[in-house]
Amino acid sequence: MAAASDVSPQSAYIQHHLVHLNNIGEKQSVIAQFNVINYDSVFWSALTGLVVVLFLWLAARRASAGVPGRFQAFVEMIVDMVDEQAKGIVTNAKSRLFVAPLALTVFLWIILMNALDLIPVDLMPTVWRWTGLGAHHGDPLYYHRILPTADLNVPMGMSLGVLLLMFYYGIKIKHPGGFVKELFTAPFHAHGIAALFLAPANLLLNLIEYAAKSVSLGMRLFGNMFAGELVFMLIALLGGAWTGLNAASVGLGIGHVLAGSVWAIFHILIVLLQAFIFMMLTLVYIGQAHEGH
């Protein structure tokens, strides 16, 4: 095994930027380590959530029946878009009273969390060094990531919430007995002794379906945002390769600026698209919970 000193500066740079501010003070050793709390993800996700709540509160407070201003028109456009999607997917009007605002909140929340990836990679670490909070190992903010959706815990936590809502509406609409019955009798319907033989297979397929929906919903958001964050780090390494006023350094510097600009512009699309996909799948999965096989 290679010694720690054998790690290249580029690898060390990326590894450092991928470590969270957590309660153990170092990188967690396994993917699922339930005794680890990533304080940075909790802080930034809570902060962006509060900003979304404040944004919607201001929009509701400033709403008027007259000619809308630019801010009100912008908010109404977003609300109408989400409401139209909800009406086409969740047919139960009573359920939509909760599901449509939920979808709107999730959409805006994910957009804001994803948008944190557009902050320059080394901006916050530089601020921490200047303030003395992250200059050396052991300092409070030596490890700190500001992109919650690139932390597997956040997207999977949100997808778990969607899964619980699927169970809730499935039980509410079909009643407990009907919900449990559907687990054992769909998608392969049969009667008599054949139904007993098919019951285990039906249950297994339904459990796999629920698990696949939940895992894929969270992993899709996490994978895209983690990859985007990693690309920004690789682009930052081009600028970090500056060794002086020479052809190679100038070329890498120009490449750093061009690649960073192009990727940032493209990443805006990813930020919006991933939020829209998560919102739409949330509506689809909750809508499916209202329907029978």
Swiss-Prot record:
It comes from the Bacteria. It is found in: Cell inner membrane. InterPro entries: ATP_syn_F0_a_bact/chloroplast (IPR045082), ATP_synth_F0_asu (IPR000568), ATP_synth_F0_asu_AS (IPR023011), F0_ATP_A_sf (IPR035908). Keywords: ATP synthesis, Cell inner membrane, Cell membrane, CF(0), Hydrogen ion transport, Ion transport, Membrane, Transmembrane, Transmembrane helix, Transport. It is a multi-pass membrane protein. The chain crosses the membrane at residues 40-60, 99-119, 151-171, 188-208, 225-245, 264-284. One of its GO terms (biological process) is proton motive force-driven plasma membrane ATP synthesis. GO terms for cellular component: plasma membrane; proton-transporting ATP synthase complex. GO terms for molecular function: proton-transporting ATP synthase activity, rotational mechanism. Belongs to the ATPase A chain family. Key component of the proton channel; it plays a direct role in the translocation of protons across the membrane. F-type ATPases have 2 components, CF(1) - the catalytic core - and CF(0) - the membrane proton channel. CF(1) has five subunits: alpha(3), beta(3), gamma(1), delta(1), epsilon(1). CF(0) has three main subunits: a(1), b(2) and c(9-12). The alpha and beta chains form an alternating ring which encloses part of the gamma chain. CF(1) is attached to CF(0) by a central stalk formed by the gamma and epsilon chains, while a peripheral stalk is formed by the delta and b chains. This is ATP synthase subunit a.
